[in-house]
Amino acid sequence: MKRKFSLLLAMIATLAVNAQNPQKGDYGYLYCHMSDKGQWTAYAVSRDGYHYEDILGGGPIMDPKEHARIEGGQRDAFICRSWDGKGYVMVTTDMNNSMTKALGKQSEWDNYGIDLLKSDDLIHWTSVSFDYRKGTEIFSNPNDKSVYKEWSTINRVWAPQIFWDPD
């Protein structure tokens, strides 16, 4: 894993050194997505927003089993800067449809949670998984009256897009 992160850092450094930036300051686009090679989050980079190249050959930027604690797969990744601009927040759907039988799911598209991740450097992540089958205990105030009666019936949870609104 250290080798992958070293390679990622080397690739990013190479891009920064070789780029002939016509603008002052940093620019470019980072796209986080589910890799077509597996059910994990991968990065791709672009200078123009149209042409992207996978980093690490589309390999995982983190261990999905460490951060997707419900099913061990990550889909629908969305990333943004943290509210203070000093880090990053990512949300992913915790789903691995190749585990349908092993997990006893009725459908390969059933899933039960989302993962919220935080990083200071886009490489090292901490995370928490929200398993909706556990009901209100996953929320910040589990004693509030629930508007939903039967949490165990929830079987299609998808990661939302996220943003910070300072107002």
Language-model segments: residues:
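Hydrophobic h-region of N-terminal signal peptides that target proteins for export
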Residues: 10-18
